[in-house]
Swiss-Prot record:
Primary role: Catalyzes the condensation of (S)-aspartate-beta-semialdehyde [(S)-ASA] and pyruvate to 4-hydroxy-tetrahydrodipicolinate (HTPA).
Entries under InterPro entries matching the protein: Aldolase_TIM, DapA, DapA-like, Schiff_base-form_aldolases_AS, Schiff_base-form_aldolases_CS
Protein name in the entry: 4-hydroxy-tetrahydrodipicolinate synthase
Subunit-structure text: Homotetramer; dimer of dimers.
Catalytic activity: L-aspartate 4-semialdehyde + pyruvate = (2S,4S)-4-hydroxy-2,3,4,5-tetrahydrodipicolinate + H2O + H(+)
Main location: cytoplasm
Length: 302
């Protein structure tokens, strides 16, 4: 069911969505039991919802069966207590359509659909790609995902504006690393587009120019602090929000010292969550960076 997107103060997916890691066992298989425990922990500690099988969830190295089983396990456990959004993007339009339709059939609350990567479509191709997905899964809310640093392709605000003619295209994860992206999207699309920061370090600046929340990595371990920062901003308590933002900056930086999700998996291990190493070709965090991360976590009393 597609909601009436008239209340900018009530974002469809909430304010804080955790882009959840995929836990692996020592034998390399997905640890579904631990995934359930982690998802519940996150939703009890600041997260309004979970994003599965995204960049942080290592979707490129998960089989379709693993992705399906992971979603079913987490969704069945959380039920309706929290939103579950599934990454269904692909650089093959037919694959993305099929994955998004399945997400709807299995009860997802939304789908995160990334800009096609590697083949670098022009804007017309991006419009055709997303409009085809929106038409095929017309009852499922979609979050566009613009991350040109990984895809090699930038989804322009003018194209997003055209795509908003589809009633299930309601939101975007803005991960270009540019604060101006929010301003440009607001200028092109107006206030009906729910814009989520794709970078923890840019959350507060992006809130100030119209973003509604964040698809977060850091919320794995500082979800309550992020929630407090957003609530403080909403109340006009800007000095409190800024103080939290500044205190968390070393952590935000450390979590992206190398390729995500390498650092966050190390951070989870350091805070008692044995989520396993990333799958090849990603590698565990090197000792020097892990020691630095440990010190930051200690300083934050996590």
């Amino acid at each position: 069911m597609i909601p009436n997107n008239t209340q900018f103060s009530n974002p469809i997916f909430g304010r804080i969505l955790t882009a959840m890691v995929t836990p692996f066992k020592e034998n390399g298989g997905v640890d579904y039991e631990l995934a359930i425990k982690l998802a519940n922990h996150l939703c009890e500690n600041g997260s309004d919802g979970i994003v599965l099988c995204g960049t942080t969830g290592e979707s490129p190295t998960l089989s379709w069966d693993e992705q399906h089983n992971l979603f079913v396990a987490v969704k069945s456990s959380l039920n309706s207590r929290s939103k579950v959004i599934v990454g269904t993007g692909s650089n093959c339009t037919s694959e993305a359509i099929e994955a998004t339709k399945k997400a709807y059939e299995f009860g997802a609350d939304g789908a995160l659909v990334v800009v096609p990567y590697y083949n670098k479509p022009p804007q017309e191709g991006l419009y055709n790609h997303f409009s085809s997905i929106a038409t095929a899964a017309s009852d499922l809310p979609l979050m566009l995902y613009n991350i040109p640093g990984r895809t090699g392709c930038n989804l322009l605000p003018t194209t997003v504006n055209k795509l908003m003619n589809f009633p299930n295209i309601l939101s975007i994860k803005a991960a270009s690393g540019r604060i101006e992206e929010v301003t440009e999207l607001r200028a092109a699309c107006g206030p009906k587009l729910f814009i989520y920061s794709g970078d923890d370090s840019l959350l507060l600046p992006m809130l100030s120019v119209g973003a509604v929340g964040v698809v977060s990595v850091a919320s794995h371990i500082v979800g309550l602090q992020l929630k407090m920062m957003i609530e403080s901003f909403q109340k006009g308590e800007f000095s409190i929000a800024l103080d939290i933002h500044e205190k968390l900056q070393p952590l935000f930086k450390a979590l992206f010292e190398t390729t995500n999700p390498i650092p966050i998996k190390a951070a989870l291990e350091l805070t008692g969550w044995q989520v396993g190493s990333p799958r090849n070709p990603l590698t565990p965090l090197i000792k020097e960076k892990k020691d630095n991360l440990f010190q930051i976590i200690q300083n934050l009393s996590l």
